[in-house]
């Protein structure tokens, strides 16, 4: 990448972690982004940027998932799907689909809140990926959404509605305005984003599936159609598989840009920034050729004309590109490290379900103090609601945290985990004799119970520094430092002087896996078997993520 200030460039992805199904807007000189959060809490992350390249996490719009009882336990593929972020009438609005309940919205006067409680706009099964539009030209409000076949038996179509201007309800039963089954070669049409531009209604919507899909654009002079379609972004001969589903944004100087995701296995859906322009008949076409009508009941062909969006390098994603014409900003990224001041986790952390009082204790010093929550599911971390998680970085990295297992009863344990359909964790557990041992366990995708990845080892003092080295294939190597100079076997020479004994490798290499729709997660957890009374606490300090391969200037 060039470092010449006269030709500054950025490199994709601009958000190298699982920020799934992004949508973006500009308000004044500020850009804001939100993403899917599924069953994690808090939900609806809110990111801010001044240059579309450097982003920081500034909060969440959804503090708890409703109904409370349904999200008391993990529901990793439920909850918040593919939100749309808009700014209208002086307020920020986020609409999303809960595939089991319907279309919801929250709104706020400022991006940091306060946000309203979720309002159900339309109840129904399988209503996903909603996007509103307040049309300044006509004064009307509209909403388009896709369908989840797993809940409704319907997919590959987009349904349009008239919406109350207050965004509180839909005013009709809806009409299919784009039927993917009528477009040769199109399948899994979803994720629509609705815009008004140059006298047209525009729907940017992906198709073809998460890993191998493409980005489509649809346009019509009337909201209810008929629409004609074009493929405007696809992999071509690049390394970016399935470049699709995201949002269009325009800078103050009039430049157009498109943010979208790429599915990268255990790393989840990382976010790319593509240049965009409006050209005469631009974009790309697949084997079915030129723009054509895709309305379900069009009654005739849509009006043709120029001015289609051209995204990336003539419809192919770019690996690097000239920066947007915006004031230079210092390098920034969503926070990962945490000292847990006052016992409070940073905003990058999310629980795997609605949290309960007492899981984390606030105090005057640094360090996250977690209660060893009693559970009948101590054999399977995937079933626990009290795992505190953050996203797995998309580049090779080293993750470390200090852990102290405080006074507790036999069976109390805590540790650092890499979670997905399969998982592995390393940590401390108190034995029947009251001593603390270093334990390392894992569970395969098909297993419903974990087992030892390495034999337990003594942990004098009930403390350890835990480490996971994660390479380019999301292969994880666990190690630990208990400060025990007597255990010199298999000592790893890390060269960082950590602890008197140094880090010692533990177990075999573990391949991180995604969950359904979600990339692998890093997790901190404290638990205990069922029983009566307080089971003890665990304290985590100095959580650090160190990127192993330095990227060029962003």
Where are these regions (language model features)?
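Carbohydrate-active catalytic/glycan-binding domains of CAZyme proteins
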Residues: 1-487, 493-554
């Amino acid at each position: 990448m060039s470092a010449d200030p006269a030709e500054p460039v950025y490199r994709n992805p601009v958000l190298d972690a699982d920020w799934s199904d992004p949508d973006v807007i500009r308000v004044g000189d500020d850009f804001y982004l939100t993403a899917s959060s599924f069953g994690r809490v808090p939900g609806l992350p809110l990111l801010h940027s001044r240059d579309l390249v450097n982003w920081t996490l500034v909060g969440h719009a959804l503090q708890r998932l409703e109904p409370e009882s349904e999200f008391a336990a993990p529901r990793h593929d439920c909850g918040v799907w593919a939100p749309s972020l808009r700014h209208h009438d002086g307020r920020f609005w986020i609409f999303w689909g809960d595939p089991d309940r319907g279309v919801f919205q929250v709104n706020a006067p400022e991006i940091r809140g306060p946000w309203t409680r979720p309002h159900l706009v339309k109840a129904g099964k399988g209503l996903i990926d909603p996007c509103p539009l307040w049309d300044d030209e006509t004064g009307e409000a509209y909403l388009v959404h896709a369908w989840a076949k797993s809940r409704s038996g319907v997919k590959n179509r987009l349904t349009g509605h008239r919406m109350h201007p207050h965004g509180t309800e839909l005013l009709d039963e809806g009409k299919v305005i784009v039927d993917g089954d009528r477009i040769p070669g199109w399948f899994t049409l979803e994720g629509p984003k609705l815009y008004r531009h140059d006298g047209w209604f525009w729907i940017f919507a992906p198709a073809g599936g998460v890993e191998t899909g493409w980005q489509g654009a649809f346009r019509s002079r009337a909201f209810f159609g008929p629409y004609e379609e074009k493929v405007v972004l696809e992999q071509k001969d690049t390394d970016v598989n399935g470049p699709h589903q995201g949002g269009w944004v325009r800078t103050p100087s009039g430049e157009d840009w498109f943010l979208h995701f790429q599915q990268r296995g255990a790393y989840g859906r990382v976010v790319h920034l593509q240049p965009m322009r409006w050209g005469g008949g631009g974009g790309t076409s697949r084997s079915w050729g030129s723009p054509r009508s895709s309305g379900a009941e069009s009654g005739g062909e849509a009006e043709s004309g120029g001015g289609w969006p051209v995204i990336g390098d003539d419809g192919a994603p770019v690996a690097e590109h000239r920066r947007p014409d915006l004031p230079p900003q210092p390098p920034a990224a969503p926070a990962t490290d945490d000292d847990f001041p006052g016992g409070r986790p940073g905003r990058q952390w999310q629980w795997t379900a609605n949290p309960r009082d007492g899981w984390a204790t606030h105090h005057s010093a640094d360090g996250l103090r977690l209660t060893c929550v009693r559970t009948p599911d101590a054999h399977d971390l995937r079933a626990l609601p009290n795992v505190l998680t953050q996203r797995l970085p998309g580049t090779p990295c080293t993750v470390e945290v200090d852990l102290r297992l405080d006074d507790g009863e036999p069976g109390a344990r805590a540790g650092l985990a890499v979670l997905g359909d399969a998982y592995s964790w390393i940590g401390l557990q108190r034995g029947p004799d009251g001593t603390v041992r270093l334990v390392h366990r894992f569970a395969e995708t098909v297993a419903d119970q974990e087992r030892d990845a390495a034999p337990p080892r003594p942990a004098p003092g009930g403390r350890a520094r835990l480490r996971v080295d994660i390479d380019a294939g999301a292969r994880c190597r666990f190690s630990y430092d208990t400060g025990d100079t007597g255990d010199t076997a298999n000592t790893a020479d890390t060269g960082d002087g950590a602890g008197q004994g140094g880090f010692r490798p533990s177990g075999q290499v573990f391949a991180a896996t995604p969950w359904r729709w979600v990339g692998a997660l890093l997790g901190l957890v404290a638990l205990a078997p069922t029983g009566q009374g307080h089971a003890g606490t665990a304290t985590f300090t100095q959580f650090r993520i160190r990127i192993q391969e330095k990227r060029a200037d962003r």
